[in-house]
């Protein structure tokens, strides 16, 4: 293996999924894991098994479904955590336990009420215990970014002696400057006995907008694994974006580093994750934002028309953007639809494809041409098929000088309900009618509308945050009619608190 090979450790399904409203079910996690395998990631952190039965089951099922990437499970430096992680990983072809503890003075004092020596001993015990189950053990020094280098080196050296094969140096708070983070990695390379027996890993957060810069600085200083997420999803301001690291390394031929990433799968995987997590990608997001390869300035447009290299350093096709997309219409057949779905990373066969095709035709009759983004939205709506509460019909009457009135019909576990109500607008009227049926005090805390496609017949996607009985639920809906999309988003929230 080349010493310049960078291992891509994807934590979209663990760290990325901690974003409020972005939780996935097991089937969706398997779908993402398979897409990550096709993308070429080396390690998939599938979850934190001890945290919930759902996380445990997801790690088990992903271990069964994925073939060549290493499947990793997170633990604390607690024996029960490690026991549960090992059980969850029993079907994995290649398995890793990721255990560790906070090492900064802040964590030692306030989180653990402990001492440096006690933390070091707990770290060693955890690694040794994990080695009883698996050969591949990764140790993380949480908040390493704010841990002084001398103590950090002691902990890392002890972890390697105990058997750690990877040592993770997280900038947990996103505080480090790139020069500081690089110096920290270099200090470990130069001062830890046995550092050649383990891989140093970066794990950078984006609280100050430096996650990608810090990760690259760490790699250039000697780290050979980086922990990333698709689209940079993650708590707070997010994590290092996989697509940014992959394309920086590929674009800079003078950087002597390589990854195993199939970059032509970047855009399809980005769209899949965005759709499944209901997390829109900002338009100006590097590599995968919809404006990443757009040019509105006249000077830029003129240059690009003469030669694309004047303003574009990446060929869009390198990241999976195909200028020759098949145009889907109501006359498109099953084969064309199936092909387009597979390009987007969505696998459908048999009856499921037939049912999806019927929904596709309904949208195609409304829109004339159906885009990739439309298909992703439709696939997201298709996931609601097992919900207890379903919209049967919606009728709204409104106009200038009229107070809107909405009539709504719901199917709740097979039983039909109807209600009508007025409101301060068509959406308000429809939501009021829903509240009459469900008889719950649900307060909308956030309401955002995103245009998915262009044109007067575009699909609108509504993201909604609703509070009920002290708990917050997130929902989304999509339709060419924004009132219907809003109602579907509210119903999505209802299903989540009922489920």
Specify the residue positions occupied by each region the protein language model found.
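Non-catalytic terminal/interface segments that mediate subunit docking, oligomerization
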Residues: 18, 23, 31-32, 368-485
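Short beta-alpha connecting loops at secondary-structure transitions
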Residues: 170-172, 227-235, 250-259, 320-326, ...
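Alpha/beta enzyme core
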Residues: 6-8, 18-43, 56-65, 79-200, ...
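A mid-to-C-terminal "edge-of-domain" accessory segment
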Residues: 5-6, 12, 247, 253-420, ...
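Catalytic alpha/beta core domains of metabolic enzymes, predominantly
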Residues: 176, 182-306
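Short, small-residue-enriched loops and turns at beta-alpha junctions
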Residues: 15, 19-20, 48-53, 104-106, ...
């Amino acid at each position: 293996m080349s010493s310049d090979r960078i291992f891509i450790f994807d934590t979209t399904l663990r760290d990325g999924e901690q974003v409020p409203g972005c939780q996935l079910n097991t089937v969706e996690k398997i779908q993402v894991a398979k897409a990550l395998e096709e993308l070429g990631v080396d390690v998939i952190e599938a979850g934190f098994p001890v945290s919930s039965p759902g996380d445990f089951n997801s790690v088990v099922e992903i271990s069964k479904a994925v073939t060549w990437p290493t499947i990793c499970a997170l633990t604390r430096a607690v024996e029960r955590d490690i026991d549960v992680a090992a059980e969850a990983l029993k079907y994995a072809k290649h398995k890793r336990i990721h255990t560790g503890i906070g090492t900064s003075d802040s964590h030692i004092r306030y989180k653990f009420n402990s001492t440096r020596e006690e933390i070091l001993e707990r770290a060693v015990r955890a690694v040794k215990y994990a080695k009883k189950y698996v050969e591949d053990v990764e140790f993380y020094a949480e908040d390493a970014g704010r841990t002084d280098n001398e103590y950090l080196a002691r902990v890392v050296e002890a972890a390697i002696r105990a058997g750690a094969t990877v040592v993770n140096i997280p900038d947990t708070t996103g505080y480090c400057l790139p020069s500081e983070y690089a110096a920290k990695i270099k200090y470990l390379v130069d001062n830890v006995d046995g550092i050649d027996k383990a891989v140093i890993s970066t794990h950078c957060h984006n609280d100050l907008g430096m996650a990608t810069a810090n990760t690259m600085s760490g790699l250039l200083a000697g780290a050979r694994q980086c922990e990333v997420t698709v689209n940079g999803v993650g708590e707070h301001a997010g994590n290092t974006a996989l697509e940014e690291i992959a394309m920086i390394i590929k674009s800079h031929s003078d950087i002597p580093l390589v990854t195993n990433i199939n970059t032509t799968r970047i855009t399809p995987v980005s769209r899949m994750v965005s759709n499944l997590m209901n997390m829109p990608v900002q338009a100006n997001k590097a590599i995968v934002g919809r404006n990443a390869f757009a040019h509105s300035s006249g000077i830029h447009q003129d240059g690009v028309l003469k030669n694309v290299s004047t303003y574009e350093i990446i060929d869009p096709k390198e990241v999976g953007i195909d200028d020759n997309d098949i145009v889907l219409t109501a006359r498109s057949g099953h084969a064309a639809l199936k092909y387009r779905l597979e390009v987007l990373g969505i696998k459908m066969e048999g009856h499921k494809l037939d049912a999806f095709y019927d929904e596709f035709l309904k949208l195609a009759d409304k829109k004339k041409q159906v885009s990739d983004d439309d298909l992703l939205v439709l696939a997201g709506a298709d996931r609601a098929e097992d919900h207890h509460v379903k919209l049967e019909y919606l009728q709204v009457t409104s106009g200038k000088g009229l107070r809107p009135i909405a009539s709504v019909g719901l199917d709740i576990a097979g039983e039909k309900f109807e209600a009508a109500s007025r409101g301060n607008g068509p959406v308000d009227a429809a939501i009021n009618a829903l509240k009459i049926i469900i008889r719950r005090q649900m307060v909308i805390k956030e309401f955002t509308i995103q245009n998915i496609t262009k044109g007067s017949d575009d699909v609108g996607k509504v993201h909604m945050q609703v509070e009920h009985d002290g708990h917050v639920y997130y929902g989304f809906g999509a339709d060419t009619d924004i009132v219907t999309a809003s109602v579907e988003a509210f119903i999505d929230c209802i299903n989540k608190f009922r489920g």
